[in-house]
Amino acid sequence: MKIAIDARTLGSRPSGVGMYLNDFLKQLIKYEDMEFVLISDVAESEYIKSFQNKGIKVYTQGKKVYKSAGVYSYFTFVKKQLELIKPDIFWEVNTIIPVKLKGDYRIMITIHDMFPIEYVEYFGRVYNIYFKHNL
């Protein structure tokens, strides 16, 4: 089974979600019946390089994603990579997918924070709309 993963949170300076992915992936790569492919904006961190050294392919956009608007351009890149990689599963670790993905693969999303969904009044209208339309 081929699993493509959005590893952007692991690309440069991982914290929180990036470290979650790092720890989870270190365990998953022990399963020989799974092939992993990472997609990232950049591959600068020691963590992502350690997966490259273990033979995991990493496809990078070549420029860091800094702002929310940059995520849309990044996902255009992700969409193209998924067409080339042809995974069985695409795993989005970052909660949102801002573009419509189509393909012969299943999509798995990890939701780390339910507060914006459950307690809308604390996050404001813009964040609420962004979260709802990108999930």
PLM feature segments, named:
Residues 1-135:
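Carbohydrate transferase catalytic cores enriched for Leloir-type hexosyltransferases
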